[in-house]
Amino acid sequence: MDFNLNENEQTIRDTTLKLASEFNDDYWLEKDKVGGFPEDFYSKFAEDGWLGIAMPEKYGGAGLGITEASLMMQAVAESGAGMSGASALHMNIFGLKPVELFGNEEQRQRFLPPLIKGKEKACFAVTEPNTGLDTTKLKTKATPDGNGYVVNGSKIWISTAQVADKVLLLTRTTDIEDVRKPTEGLTLFYTDLDRDRIEVREIDKMGRKAVDSNMLFIDGLKVPIAVSYTHLTLPTNREV
């Protein structure tokens, strides 16, 4: 197997490394001391079109793949930005793949372009206080309510929730005792991060202060039916 980069991959790596290197060690040292999302760093990558590297062209992306996106993220981390820089960008790049793969066309047109352009930020809310990495045991519950769902529960170690406009939220819509397999009965929502219904409480850390980590306390969050999707258990013949 040939692990050498082709010309296009090398160009992506070189260009993004050069761009990220405009933000030197002093910039990241200051961010790590005082905290605060690296808005200018994020905006620069958005302006140059890199946030859509792995998204289809029809939604404003570059139409490339996960390999190219990974090379970009490696270059960002190598530049001195480390995990702070990578974590500031990764949700926009990778996080809405479920929308691309499983959302309907109206949802893709509505949700993907603002994230690709950097006009919206999102966080990914899966991990819970008492479930660790066993995602099937999560307790956050979404209950049908008229034309949508009402969500209650808690999440932990959720990055960028202090600055996010949207949240990609994994919930249980059928109790684990009532499903054939623990991977069933899970529903993924992409919706507004309504701070009247979601308390975002930052967790103090010893490092990586440029990107906040948080606990979320969700109390009666209403999600319209139009923004939900339930296709989390893929058919065995489906390739992703």
Q: What feature does the model see in each segment?
A:
Residues 1-89, 97, 106-117:
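Amphipathic, small/basic residue-rich leader segments at the start of a protein or domain
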Residues 49, 72-77, 170-173, 191-195, ...:
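Short Ser/Thr-interspersed hydrophobic loop/turn segments at strand-loop and sheet-helix junctions
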Residues 134-152:
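Cytochrome P450 C-terminal beta-domain/meander region
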Residues 152-201:
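A short core secondary-structure module
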